[in-house]
Swiss-Prot record:
It comes from Citrus sinensis (Sweet orange). It catalyses: all-trans-violaxanthin = all-trans-capsorubin; all-trans-antheraxanthin = all-trans-capsanthin. Belongs to the lycopene cyclase family. GO terms for molecular function: capsanthin synthase activity; capsorubin synthase activity; oxidoreductase activity, acting on paired donors, with incorporation or reduction of molecular oxygen. This is Capsanthin/capsorubin synthase, chromoplastic. NAD(+) binds at residues 88-117. It comes from the Eukaryota.
């Protein structure tokens, strides 16, 4: 869902998405919303022309006005003549890469180099988070817009009002803060694309497109979902979240300015679109909306999860029909984004010679698409594991280092919890619009401790089991029938995977 949005300066024109790895690969997600490498701002004139038709409304024909921006910041650059051997090389300067660089470089003088084709580019995606998540990790000052409440439209007759504040991340403020801390800690930067990663027993190196080779004890891949540097030994049977979003100036809109719309599952806008309505009944999409003022709003039509992925053209067509039905006339498209987020699937091989964080590490929430806040929160623990090996006099390297850092990110309890979240994703994949509505009707009736914890990946395995029992108790009879008839296969798969993890 698009919890996922995009980087602006701290002006009201910023949006929030949850892909958090490489600068050049945007993404976004609803349960943050937070998505990566999958979401991108589009200004391709040919793309818009290709799908243009008056049936879908004028906004699809409007060209986004945003252009790539760069931070005005002096970085300390890597110089080949220095012949420095680093402790850690981090590939990618998205939120995940810079957060880890900031954290690990502050521990025991660990030497870090970040490599990215454009380290000063503003992040091209938006990030949305629950305010309490950023409060817990000391980053609340990086939010430039907050809403005291969120709401979920189950259908035309039922709306859930959630007393949990939601915020939009200022991409420029967050990136500047991370860069400032990195520079203070002695992190070096290299402007290049990594072509190859090579490994020896106690040392690794990267080869860049400018011909430079840089050596380190540990390589960390934070470059996003599309990376080829991280190995998998199981089929990557992802579900996919796909969305189309626009930051738009509109003549007016119907949203309350003090409420962020987390999900709108209504489908009355498809009454005159029989094909779209029929397909939406099987593979539903919802609207995600962040109203900034009476004329500025971020709007995103999102397929929560599907396999195979829902057509992007279909998503845009549904969005156009929805906005037309709601009477929202778009005057200007300031940004638009296409978001495609792989969800669930197997974890990378653990351990392996390349460490990972962000989209390529499996951190994205399999059932929601959230990732940014979680990555920000987990980076310090991973930094501790790295520093324990490389910042001490012991200098643990090679396979013991890889084992230590991978287990620092994915300890057994976290891997087991992920199996449960993946079970949630597999369940959602089997629900049509009516089943999805029933599910979220019951889900947001749970004790806030449960639904807060589920969306923020905070619950233990025992608590997740308690959530399941409570959800079954809150569910309607029809929803219970969905659970009984559609969940056994995913449940058996989850139990088998849990058994394998604990052996």
């Amino acid at each position: 869902m698009a919890t996922l949005l995009s980087p602006f300066s701290p002006s009201p024109l910023a949006k929030v998405s949850q892909i958090i790895d490489s600068t050049s690969s945007p993404s976004f997600s609803l349960f943050p919303l937070g998505r990566q490498n999958a979401c991108s701002r589009k200004a391709d004139h040919h793309h818009h022309h290709r799908i243009r038709t008056s049936k879908f409304g004028n906004f699809l024909e409007l060209t986004p006005e945003s252009v790539p921006e760069f931070l005005d910041f002096d970085l300390p650059w890597f110089h080949p003549s220095d012949r420095i051997r680093y402790d850690v090389i981090i590939i990618g300067t998205g939120p995940a890469g810079l957060r880890l660089a900031e954290q690990v470089s502050s521990r025991h003088s660990v030497k870090v180099c970040c490599v990215d084709p454009s380290p000063l580019s503003t992040w091209p995606n938006n990030y949305g988070v629950w305010v309490d998540e950023f409060e817990d990790i000391g980053l609340v000052d990086c939010l430039d817009k907050t809403w005291p409440m969120t709401c979920v439209f189950i259908n035309d007759h039922k709306t859930k009002y959630l007393d949990r504040p939601y915020g939009r991340v200022s991409r420029n403020i967050l990136k500047t803060k991370l860069l400032e801390n990195c520079v203070s800690n002695g992190v070096k930067f290299h402007k290049a694309k990594v072509w190859h990663v090579n490994h020896q027993e106690f040392e690794s190196s990267i080869v860049c497109d400018d011909g430079n080779e840089i050596k380190a004890s540990l390589i960390v891949d934070a470059s996003g979902f599309a990376s080829s540097f991280v190995e998998y030994d199981k089929p990557r049977n992802h579900g996919y979240q796909i969305a189309h979003g626009i930051l738009a100036e509109v003549e007016s809109h119907p949203f309350d300015l003090d409420k962020m719309v987390l999900m709108d599952w209504r489908d009355s806008h498809l009454g005159n679109e029989p094909y779209l309505r029929a397909s939406n009944l099987k593979l539903p999409t919802f609207l995600y909306a962040m109203p900034f003022d009476s004329n500025l709003v971020f709007l995103e039509e999102t397929s929560l999860v599907s396999r195979p992925v829902l057509s992007y053209k279909e998503v845009k067509s549904r969005m156009a029909a929805r906005l037309r039905h709601m009477g929202i006339r778009v005057k200007r498209v300031i940004e638009d984004e296409k978001c495609l987020i792989p969800m669930g699937g197997p974890l990378p091989v653990i351990p392996q010679s390349v460490m990972a964080i962000g989209g390529t590490s499996g951190l994205i929430h399999p059932a929601t698409g959230y990732m940014v806040a979680r990555t920000m929160a987990l980076a310090p623990a991973l930094a501790d594991a790295i520093a324990e090996c490389l910042g001490s006099t012991r200098m643990i390297r090679g396979r013991p280092l890889h084992q230590k850092v991978w287990n620092g990110l994915w300890p057994i309890d976290r891997r087991c919890n992920r199996e449960f979240y993946s079970f949630g994703m597999e369940t959602l994949l089997k629900l049509d619009l009516k089943g999805t509505r029933r599910f979220f009707d019951a889900f947001f009736d749970l004790n806030p401790y449960y639904w807060h914890g589920f969306l923020s990946s905070r619950l233990s395995l025992a608590e997740l089991a308690g959530l399941s029992l409570s959800l079954f108790g809150h569910a309607s009879n029809s929803s219970r029938l969905d659970i009984v008839t559609k969940c056994p296969v995913p449940l058996v798969k989850m139990m088998g995977n849990l058994a394998l993890e604990t052996i």
